[in-house]
Every structure is written in C-alpha cells, then in structure tokens.
Amino acid sequence: MKATEVVEKLKNRFPNEPEYIQAVSQVLGTIEDEYNKHPECEKANLIDRLCIPDRLIEFRVSWVDDKGNVQTNMGYRVQHNNCIGPYKGGLRFHKSVNLSILKFLAFEQTFKNSLTTLPMGGAKGGSDFSPRGKSNAEVMRFCQAFMTELYRHIGPDEDVPAGD
C-alpha cells in the first residue's frame, strides 16, 4: 500500500484530527520507498501498527476553584506504542489541547524515544486546562484531580508520564 493510500484511509477514519494526519503523512512520505522494498511489512500491517495508537484514554477532570465552584476539564492520555518498553511521554496543560494534538505528539514521541538508548515507548497526555491566571491552589487541586483519574493507567512498567 502506498503512503498516499494509507494517509487517505487515515483521513477517512480520523476526519477531525488534522495535526495527527499531517504528522503521519510526513513520516510515511519519508519511509515509503524503503517500506515498498519489503513486502513482509505490508503483510504484517506495519503501517497501521505504527501509526494508530495502542490506546486512547479520555476522562473528565472535575476540580474546585478558589470560589468553591466545581470546574470541569477534559483529560487525555495517548499510549501510542510500547514495543520497546513502557510508554513514556509528557503531560501538557493548555486550553488548545485536544486528542488530535496529543496523538500527533505521542506519534512523534515514539520516534524520539526509539532513538535513545533507553527501552521506552511513546505516549503523550494532558488537558485543556490552562494554568494561566489560576492560583497555585487551583493548579494544585486541578493536578490532584487529574492524577486521581490518570493513576490507574500509569506505573513504572506500564506508562511513565514526564514533563512537556
């Protein structure tokens, strides 16, 4: 299968994820010639296995602001690939965070981690929570609520969050 065919398939499967599609398209364009020399790669469905994350975790994060009001944000963790070791990747808190951006970042993190000498897979997570303008207490309450939801999916042998 040609890279353009794979990208079209992914565009149809994930139509609202332009950042993710762009990252995959760029990588596939660079490996297409080498990939086509090895028919065993297509038989093993290597491209789908490389491009599609292992797991997407989406959750609500409810936290209390300084006025006592409950606020709600979305939390995410994209566990992209753990073929060479536990998932590892940063957490990003910013109002622009969405699943497409995190899938793109987790995809890239997989390649970055594979180039180190450490056995680590790739992941990325975060929330549409923006710490800008929040008090230290609000940021702390948000982070506590975020980790209360995320903790069941992480651990030293499974997924290791890092700074962004």
Task: Provide a role label for each language-model segment.
Residues 1-164:
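N-terminal ligand-binding/catalytic initiation module
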